[in-house]
Amino acid sequence: MPKRILQGTVVSDKNEKTVVVKVERRFTHPVMKKTVRMTKKYKAHDENNAHKVGDQVFIQESKPISKDKRWIVVSSDQA
């Protein structure tokens, strides 16, 4: 099974080798037929502490690194 890749924004880089990435998901509500935005925060491994708050990054699913980390930052989208 392929590993999932998500795009999001770094909202915290205070932890060592860890960033918190906010991923936004949009979908049409099945009853109201209105576009709904939902966000979720993921802790991702950032080996070199290269990413700062506000950066757009891609994260990839991986094996568990710690209690909360199951994602790795794979690349940065400099937009």
UniProtKB/Swiss-Prot annotation:
Alphabetical keyword list: Ribonucleoprotein, Ribosomal protein, RNA-binding, rRNA-binding
Keyword Phosphoprotein: no
UniProt-listed InterPro entries: NA-bd_OB-fold, Ribosomal_uS17, Ribosomal_uS17_bact/chlr, Ribosomal_uS17_CS
Annotated GO CC locations: cytosolic small ribosomal subunit
UniProt xrefs under Gene3D superfamilies: Nucleic acid-binding proteins (2.40.50.140)
Example GO biological process: translation
Gene Ontology molecular function: any one: structural constituent of ribosome
CDD domains with a match to the protein in the record: Ribosomal_uS17
Assigned protein family: Belongs to the universal ribosomal protein uS17 family.
Function description: One of the primary rRNA binding proteins, it binds specifically to the 5'-end of 16S ribosomal RNA.
Oligomer and partners: Part of the 30S ribosomal subunit.
Protein name in the entry: Small ribosomal subunit protein uS17
Gene that this sequence comes from: rpsQ
